[in-house]
């Protein structure tokens, strides 16, 4: 009886070749296709997998779970890798791998396989998730397999093999970039972008219009949160209202994209130590992250916020490096959920030519006291108390300066 392997399958050249290669090695290959919002023809992908040799194909719609359990969870900690990247690819990988493990368990498969390269981050994200959720599963990673590497030294070898085996290859002109698309973002890498001094051509961008070409008209959105989670979006001009999590996020993507929001061009540090240039389009999440952070400004205690902000870079790093299912992540999420208990209210954002600016906010749990904050009203605050406050904090500075200058106390 053949051993079963569940292959994370995209329908592209690499995973199609891997599927056939695994079949030839004697495996019963079950193809698994994850719909996380990419614009693919899933019917055609399923048909291609079956023709290539898969015994069964799972096409799983994970979009809603992606939004509620992954994107919104990352939002609780304002996750941004190296201060800029909103982690669109990294956040999707643990979800994809989790469902792959579930299918393997359901099918009684002994193996899981993926087509991630040996230079990138995704191999780590997939395999750490496999290990965390079912350490008994064996992993086949062809791009780290000496036999596979000896047979396929590059794209030409893959194409020749596909033609030899009758695997359909798209004849349409391929974009000269390596791209990853899901509901949260689309990323563009490789090609001319490998030169960090190269200014991307406008045709790189497929989701967003250039801010220069965006409408010369402000869009006002009112975004509602409960315990840090987005629950409603209202367009204050045309009255459009979205409360379903998936529809809400798709609407923010739509509004952000047509207004040139969410473009990012950066060189980042991959987990394995290689620097990589990525160009990203993340319109909806950019709007959410900005609005959420603004609401925290009136609802979160100062020290709690500052502690959370100290932990946020580590949170983003854990997501980027593939440690979504880890004890340290459980610890951080428990703390973040506690910190978000009063992050409830609404924020109005002005969206205009690539910019997202909070212009109003309200919360029933607001810690903002107009009288205390006023320049004109005392509001129970005794200004003379500030003298002692300053003296206490100045004491160590005075001592440090005296010692520095060589004086004795």
Curated annotation (Swiss-Prot):
Pfam families: Arginosuc_syn_C (PF20979), Arginosuc_synth (PF00764). Its EC number is 6.3.4.5. GO terms for biological process: argininosuccinate metabolic process; L-arginine biosynthetic process; urea cycle. It catalyses: L-citrulline + L-aspartate + ATP = 2-(N(omega)-L-arginino)succinate + AMP + diphosphate + H(+). L-citrulline binds at residues 85, 121, 125, 178, 187, 268, 280. The keyword Protein transport does not apply. It is found in: Cytoplasm. Signal peptide: none annotated. The keyword Nucleotide-binding applies. GO terms for cellular component: cytoplasm. Keywords: Amino-acid biosynthesis, Arginine biosynthesis, ATP-binding, Cytoplasm, Ligase, Nucleotide-binding. ATP binds at residues 8-16, 34, 115. Pathway: Amino-acid biosynthesis; L-arginine biosynthesis; L-arginine from L-ornithine and carbamoyl phosphate: step 2/3. Disulfide bonds: none annotated. GO terms for molecular function: argininosuccinate synthase activity; ATP binding. InterPro entries: Arginosuc_syn_C (IPR048268), Arginosuc_syn_N (IPR048267), Arginosuc_synth (IPR001518), Arginosuc_synth_CS (IPR018223), Arginosuc_synth_type_1_subfam (IPR023434), AS_cat/multimer_dom_body (IPR024074), Rossmann-like_a/b/a_fold (IPR014729). PROSITE patterns: ARGININOSUCCIN_SYN_1, ARGININOSUCCIN_SYN_2. L-aspartate binds at residues 117, 121-122. Homotetramer. HAMAP family: Arg_succ_synth_type1 (MF_00005). Belongs to the argininosuccinate synthase family. Type 1 subfamily. This is Argininosuccinate synthase. The gene is argG.
């Amino acid at each position: 009886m053949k051993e079963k392997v569940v292959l994370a399958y995209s329908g592209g050249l690499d995973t199609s070749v891997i599927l056939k290669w695994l079949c030839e090695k004697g495996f019963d290959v079950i193809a698994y296709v994850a719909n996380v919002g990419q614009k693919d023809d899933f019917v055609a992908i399923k048909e291609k997998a079956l023709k290539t040799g898969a015994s069964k194909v799972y096409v799983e719609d994970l979009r809603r779970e992606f939004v509620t359990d992954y994107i919104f969870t990352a939002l609780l900690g304002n996750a941004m890798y190296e201060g800029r990247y909103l982690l669109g690819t990294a956040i999707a990988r643990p979800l994809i791998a989790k469902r792959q493990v579930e299918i393997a368990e359901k099918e009684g498969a002994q193996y899981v396989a993926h087509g991630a390269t040996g230079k990138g981050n995704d191999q780590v994200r997939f395999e750490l998730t496999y290990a965390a959720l079912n350490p008994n599963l064996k992993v086949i990673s062809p791009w780290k397999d000496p036999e596979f590497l000896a047979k396929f030294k590059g794209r030409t070898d893959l194409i020749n093999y596909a033609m030899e085996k009758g695997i359909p290859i798209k004849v349409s002109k391929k974009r000269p970039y390596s791209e990853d698309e899901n509901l949260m973002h689309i990323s563009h890498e490789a090609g001319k972008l490998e030169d960090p001094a190269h200014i991307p051509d406008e045709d790189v961008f497929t989701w967003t219009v250039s801010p220069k070409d965006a409408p010369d008209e402000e869009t006002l959105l009112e975004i509602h949160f409960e315990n840090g989670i987005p629950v409603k979006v209202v367009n204050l001009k045309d009255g459009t209202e979205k409360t379903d999590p998936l529809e809400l996020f798709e609407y923010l993507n739509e509004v952000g994209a047509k207004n040139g929001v969410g473009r990012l061009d950066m060189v980042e540090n991959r987990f394995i130590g290689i620097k990589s240039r990525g160009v990203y389009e993340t319109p909806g999440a950019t709007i959410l992250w900005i609005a959420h952070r603004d609401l925290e400004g009136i609802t979160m205690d100062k020290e709690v916020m500052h502690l959370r902000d100290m932990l946020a870079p580590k949170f983003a790093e854990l997501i980027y490096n593939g440690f979504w299912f880890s004890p340290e992540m459980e610890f951080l999420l428990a703390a973040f959920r506690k910190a978000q208990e009063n992050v409830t209210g609404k924020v109005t954002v002005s969206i205009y030519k690539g910019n997202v600016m909070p212009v109003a906010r309200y919360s029933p749990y607001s810690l903002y006291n107009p009288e205390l904050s006023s320049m004109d009203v005392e509001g129970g605050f005794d200004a003379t108390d500030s003298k002692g406050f300053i003296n206490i904090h100045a004491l160590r500075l005075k001592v440090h300066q005296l010692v520095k200058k060589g004086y004795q106390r």
